[in-house]
């Protein structure tokens, strides 16, 4: 099926640029590490501010990685070829965003036990953090994809991309950190996780169409 061929191709291309994959991950880890060094190793304080630290770091690292979502395709001319495929352009966008999450969002999940240890979180807090990252990091990709498509042809589109995308991430940031706060106090988190799941379902449904329209505008 052409969808999965595009997905596998995107993964292969991403792994050829391993440095661009590693940079956001290093940024995420460095930001997480700086907080215990700057405010001290007090476990209660670190656990209290951990939700905000983790999600701001995840948001900023995802913005670093988002810029290359369509940039390489535009530079080598393959973006126009993707638009001519018999597969609908929203499906192509969906495959690209999924592959992008596999190489940028999934590693954050793998690093989550280390992050929990650095910030003094308990096992339940780590489990909820991992769930928020599982639901929230692909949502970040879907929220950012239309902005990337609109700015892909600009030489210095990074600042404009941040201005476009950051306001859209505020609800995600609120509910993800609220879920982790509730977990730290051993309160129910099902409602917060349900909202995060709804945000993921909504963005995964609507974002490919908005991104496809933005790509057509940028190419023209």
Swiss-Prot record:
Residues 1-20, 66-100, 149-158, 214-220 are cytoplasmic. Pfam families: CcmB. InterPro entries: Cyt_c_biogenesis_CcmB, Cyt_c_CcmB_bac. The chain crosses the membrane at residues 21-41, 45-65, 101-121, 128-148, 159-179, 193-213. Keywords: Cell inner membrane, Cell membrane, Cytochrome c-type biogenesis, Membrane, Transmembrane, Transmembrane helix, Transport. GO terms for molecular function: heme transmembrane transporter activity. It is a multi-pass membrane protein. GO terms for cellular component: ATP-binding cassette (ABC) transporter complex; plasma membrane. Belongs to the CcmB/CycW/HelB family. Required for the export of heme to the periplasm for the biogenesis of c-type cytochromes. PANTHER family: CYTOCHROME C BIOGENESIS B-RELATED (PTHR30070:SF1), HEME EXPORTER PROTEIN B (PTHR30070). This is Heme exporter protein B. The gene is ccmB.
